[in-house]
Structures are given as C-alpha cells and as structure tokens.
UniProtKB/Swiss-Prot annotation:
Homotetramer. Gene3D superfamilies: Hexapeptide repeat proteins, Spore Coat Polysaccharide Biosynthesis Protein SpsA, Chain A. It holds the Pfam family NTP_transferase. The gene is glgC. Keywords: ATP-binding, Carbohydrate metabolism, Glycogen biosynthesis, Glycogen metabolism, Nucleotide-binding, Nucleotidyltransferase, Transferase. The keyword GTP-binding does not apply. Involved in the biosynthesis of ADP-glucose, a building block required for the elongation reactions to produce glycogen. Catalyzes the reaction between ATP and alpha-D-glucose 1-phosphate (G1P) to produce pyrophosphate and ADP-Glc. Alpha-D-glucose 1-phosphate binds at G164, E179, K180, S197. Its EC number is 2.7.7.27. The keyword Chloroplast does not apply. One of its GO terms (biological process) is glycogen biosynthetic process. It comes from Corynebacterium jeikeium (strain K411). HAMAP family: GlgC. This is Glucose-1-phosphate adenylyltransferase.
Amino acid sequence: MKSRSNVLSIVLAGGEGKRLYPFTADRAKPAVPFGGNYRLIDFVLSNLVNAGYYKICVLTQYKSHSLDRHISQSWQLSGLTGQYITPVPAQQRLGKRWFTGSADAILQSLNLVYDEQPDYIIVFGADHVYRMDPEQMVQEHIKAGAGVTVAGLRVPRHEATAFGVIQADDDNKIEQFLEKPAEPPSVPDDPEVSFASMGNYVFTAQTLIDALKEDSEDENSNHDMGGDIIPRLVDRGEAYVYDFSNNYVPGETERDKGYWRDVGTVDAFYEAHMDLISVHPVFNLYNQQWPIHTAETGNLPPAKFVKGGIAQSSMVSAGCIISAGTVRNSVLSENVVVEEGASVEGCVIMPGVRIGRGAVVRHAIIDKNVQVSAGEIIGVDRARDQDRFTISKGGVVCIGKNVVV
C-alpha cells in the first residue's frame, strides 16, 4: 500500500493507567497484553499501518521499557523508504520537566512535526480495542475544511454521561464539547443517542501547531487534548465530528461493525476479552482482510493438549500446554501451562503462567509468570481472595506478575 506522505501520525501512549492496576504496576497501559498474542498498542498501530500510514511517532513516558521494547521488536518498518514507527520519550526540550498533559506531550515533540512538514496530523490514543480505517476520517476532514475532526462513537444517551460528549449540527460541525455532562445532547438524527468522543483526532497541521502554542501560554490550562485543545477549536468554529458508524473496514461483519472498547478499567478489560471467545464473537480477531499485527509470539510451537486436556469456548495461544486440565471461556496467552486436574474458567491468563495440579481458577486475570500452586483455589471464596488479591468492582480477581500463590 502506498505511504501517505503528507500525513504524520502521533500515538499518545504516555498515560499511567492507574485504573488498570495491578497490570500497570510495571508497564505502561498500552503495553498490557491483550487477546492472547497482542499488546493494546497493536490495535491502533495496525489500523494506521493497514490504512497506509507509515510515519508514526509513539509518545511515551511512564514505565515505558516494555512498550519501547515491543515497538522495537514487533514494529520494524523500512527506514530506507522513509517509513518508521518510533517510540519518543519525553525529551525535556522546553525545560527539565515531564509531559504535563497530552497537549504538552505533542508541544514538546513539535520538532518531529517540523522535520516531516505534514499537511495533516493524526492524533490517536494507544489503549482502545477496535478496528478503523483512519484514511476515511482524513478524507472527511479534508472535505469539510476542518481545523480538527473528532471521531464520535454513537452510544445510548443514558450511557454518555461517562464520556466527553459532542454536540454537532446537521453538517457535523461541533457546537459544544462537554465533559461527562449530566444531560448529554443527542445526535441530530436520533434523540436517544449521543456522540461520545473516541479520543481520536485529525488536525490540519498548522491549526494544531497554533493551538498548542496558544495553550502553552495559558496558565489555567491543563494542557489536555480533549479538555483544552478541542474546546478551543470548537469555540472558533473549526471542529467537526466524524461518525465512526460510517467507517468501513474490509472483512468486518454486522456483528463487529463499529466495535470500540475503552479498556481502561479492570472490568472493561475483562469484558473485552470475553467479547472474543464466542462462536460468533462481538470482536473478531480472525479478520485477515484487516489484520491486527504483532510479532509477540516469535517462533513458539503450537499449543498442545495431552492426557485428555481440553479447552472449550476459549482462545489458547502458541506454546501453551494443557495436560489433563480443563479450560473454559478463557483467553490464554503464550506459554501457559495447565497441569493435571486443574480447572480454569472465565479467566484471562497472560504469558508464562503455570496453573498447578488440581488448582481451580475462576473469574480472574492473572499477569505474566505467575505460578498458581497445586490445589490452590482462586475466584471461589471472595472473602479469602480479598485478603490476598485485588478484586475489581465487578468481582474479577486480579493477580500481578511474577508471584507464587
């Protein structure tokens, strides 16, 4: 696919991800494993690359080592042809300080924009699960003559109170941008639906540069893209909404069209995994016309089931061994071992976990390299689990990496 040389893509990957603790205790949220083989950042990078955008800067900050390593190992493009996906940590170009917000992160990285001199700049988040062809959004942005275009997700109006909400006119021009309003405005064609901001933006380059510089001089600003930059451009009449429901991705089905999940909490992260494992999944990882790319599994052998080991309604990644154990309604990352008599149900298991002989694990997320001892019981006795582990509001047992339980 031809590289779109007049567009620079910036992926915001510097957030701490506190609500996803303990899985962000030692890594940035975009580096959290997802769906067996992937990291969260693989979804946005796949969308950009599949659409032909090969100049991508990933702005990082907190606990970025595993994220930087993943990008370096999994996302190598040809520098000889001007293609790159590069992690960019805080450079402290404007003083000895870290990024103070998403807008400040881009402001401190404007040298990248000046080097490329793009006409348009894509600014996407790094921690959502979805498929999207961003080229369609770019074309709508150009057609509208917008300064910024904001991707809008149609959600039931009663659920929109949890989002930044867009009020737009019949021509998709944004009239208001409201943060978690008690009375969300509806979309023009449906009184029961609102536009929630997806945190994905397309800017005319000079518009973004000017807005960032103005924002940097505002002492009352939090220097946030959604909270400060977008409202500034809305007030000027330069902001438009892009209706995500109009986006078409090759190979999509009616069931997974328009799928988008913010997995910023443990319960949302868990439920997004459960979306993957039905016979006709709500989100289909097997769409090869718009693949989710990664090199995470390397040269691992196929999963192996021995001594009557079984897995039902589950995803089991390469290198796993199920030996006379049972796995149901679960997602297993690579190199997971389930020993004889062990039972795993309704779980998300990250790489390198060993479930010991006769252990029972229910309704849990277990991070990398955890060893569950023989005969251990997790997710059955909540009172006992609360004394040992983190438990989400939805009752998901959370076990951090590199421990023996």
